[in-house]
Design a protein with these regions (language model features):
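Polytopic alpha-helical membrane proteins, predominantly small-molecule transporters/carriers
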Residues: 1, 9-306
């Protein structure tokens, strides 16, 4: 970390993670080049998760697709960071953060995923083809399940990137709640690269370069892209703020990403109910779904209670 005798007064500009009198460029001219590269690399892998994440919702719907993908992301994202850090930096003893309480939380999370998966299977077997298409146009449980698991695994690389970039900040000069913001920026840059390459590939494959000249669609596209980006990024800004309040609890700090994903699952299923994706399912199926959601919520807080 940066532990030089820099002024402690904060800047009032938008660079919340950068002390007054310093610039973001100083972070990238440090000896953290390996961490910077690894943080961006896992951002690239996370970008793959983002691409497949959309497909999981296409084939499973918002509720089931997000539940399986984000549940897998929560469990693996929590474990992979310390494991990979221990491989590259054994002197940090990162595995020590994977306490019995944390492992129990992850296991309970995976149980919650399994229960929600059972609810999805029950939905697939109980509805007619017409009902399935009415709820989710391209519903395909086996295909969607495989894609959702892949999306969850790759999306977990976001938290791994944050783990490798944890020290890319100005140390004590940066408030705890802002310390992960530089790493978050690097991970999202890596994800942007993946998505940009894929979009350009699709443009070339489908010969749709001319669509960029259709000025009539630019207004709505830019507006909703900005809105989606702001709303989506706010969760990771909230993650950074939340970690700042959890520094006294190593267990909750390690599980913070898992907690965020669990809350995503809860609200995605609320939207799934609002959008009537579970319309026509038996009461038993709904009960199983709710049980899975409750298990995921419990998994976020159980380790702290043990």
């Amino acid at each position: 970390r940066f532990r030089h005798s820099f002024p402690t007064r904060r800047s009032s500009d938008l660079w919340l993670a950068v002390p007054e009198g310093h610039s973001m460029c100083e972070l990238f001219n440090s000896d953290n080049s390996f961490n910077i590269v690894m943080t961006m690399l896992f951002g690239v892998l996370w970008g793959v998760g983002g691409l497949t994440f959309g497909l999981s919702m296409r084939y499973l719907g918002v509720a089931l697709g997000q539940s399986i993908a984000l549940g897998t992301c929560a469990g693996l994202g929590t474990i992979m960071g310390p494991v990979l850090l221990n491989i590259f930096f054994p002197e940090q003893n990162a595995l020590a953060s994977l306490t019995a309480s944390v492992i129990i939380g992850v296991v309970v999370t995976l149980i919650g995923i399994a229960v929600i998966g059972v609810a999805g299977s029950m939905k697939a077997s109980s509805l007619s083809d017409e009902q399935k298409k009415e709820a989710v146009k391209d519903f395909n449980f086996p295909k969607g399940l495989a894609i959702a698991l892949l999306a969850g695994f790759m999306s977990g690389c976001f938290n791994v990137g944050l783990a490798f970039g944890a020290d890319i900040n100005f140390g004590d000069l940066t408030p705890d709640m802002y310390k992960t913001l530089p790493a978050t920026m690097l991970v999202t840059v890596g994800g942007f690269f993946t998505n940009a390459v894929y979009c350009l590939y699709q443009n070339n494959k489908n010969r749709t370069w001319g669509d960029y000249l259709k000025t009539s669609v630019w207004g709505n596209n830019i507006l909703f892209c900005l809105l989606a980006g702001a709303l989506w990024y706010s969760q990771f800004f909230g993650l950074s703020l939340g970690k700042g309040f959890l520094t006294e609890s190593a267990t909750l700090t390690t599980l913070s990403f898992c907690i965020l994903m669990a809350l995503n699952v809860v609200f995605s299923n609320i939207w799934g109910i609002i959008l009537k994706e579970w319309k026509g399912c038996s009461p038993k199926t709904i009960v199983v779904l709710v049980v899975g959601i409750v298990i995921l919520i419990i998994s976020s807080f159980l380790p702290q209670l043990i």
